[in-house]
Amino acid sequence: MKRTALILGMACVVLAGGSAARGEDKAIQPTEKIVLFDGKSFDGWVRHVRGGGDVEKTWTVKDGVLACTGRPPGYIRTAKSYKNYVFHVEYRWAGKTGNNGILVHMVGQDRVWPKSLECQGMYRNQGDYFEIGGVEFNEHKIKGHRARGRRVAKYGQHNEKKPGEWGVYEVWCVGGTVRPYVNGKLMNEATDCSLTEGKICLQSEGAPIEFRNIYVAPADKKPWPVVPTKKIELFNGKDLDGWVRFIPNDKPDKDKKWTVDKVWSVTDGVIHCTGKPHGYIRTCESYANYKLHVEWRWADKPTNSGVLLHRAGIDRVWPKCVEAQLMHQNAGDFWIIGGATLKHAGTVKKGHAAKKNPSNEKAPGQWNNYDIVCDGGKVALTINGLLQNEGTDADPSSGPICLQSEGSAIEFRNVYLEPLDK
């Protein structure tokens, strides 16, 4: 009996110890701001460099600043894991610019490039992603002009400050979504990430860089979907900054020109779309509760197009969304696509939901106005001043807005959002 009791007692100790170990490894979800760098020491951090080198030569702390020489390659990481947070860091190049990165959801053993999702810190490339160690996410899976090798390029122009000036890099990690913001501008989005928690690393990768004011905070007040409080120009009249171009199987030709470059272009304040092959441009940002204004005209024989509201999931030709139809003579119809739903005339619909009145589109070559109101789950479509369709209980009710390529040449201009109360 005594031997049995002793064995049982030891088993309880082992189990308790195992539980404690698992508890220590459990990812922290911040409920308040957690300061990660105290400005004086490396408390709460683990340093790692290639070949087991002298970390004291790579990383130092002085005057409230965490300084990195950039050599040899490696990183400094949090000792603890985190999930569902916003990571905040201020940074500046201490001399010559170069390469760096923020690794989120780092798991596994310490090595120079551990399994993680890198939010690129390279000069003029901040906001790119690098997949490290087999991390999967939607935007990497679809390949195309933005996804080359392990890299997924940022949305558009950089938003970095001049070398020597302090910039702000924030990374929002919410569930399977990762969003990097550089000086307040959304630079990219990774969705359905295979990793949703882990340690956070600041890289040493080539050039001297300094960090300060490092913390994580709760992600309960995420900055998306954006609800307009003033007019938002979605199209700047000059280029497609703020938009993502999508064509399936997007490939470069012999002149290294990608398919999306042939389908979409901008001249004289107008977005031109060839209509073939099928695809769309979509806003980088997600929106909810707004008035959308779009002007369109057929540049050739009129065929088909549409405004896709609140695209959800992975980019594909017909994603989950509510389509405000632009097919010639059918503008104002709804098409509910990809598993989306909408209540129309009292019935939950999937597929087609016809407009109320005969077509009031203008002749091909003339500009038309599309005014769309999205208010919670309510959606109303007005063509050239005439209310053509209404629906309620839309799912999804927020997300990016897309303009389709689906048939023949079409043009768009004056694309903007306004608040509902205007």
Question: What residue ranges belong to the model's regions?
Answer:
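Positively charged n-region of N-terminal signal peptides that target proteins for export
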Residues: 1-4
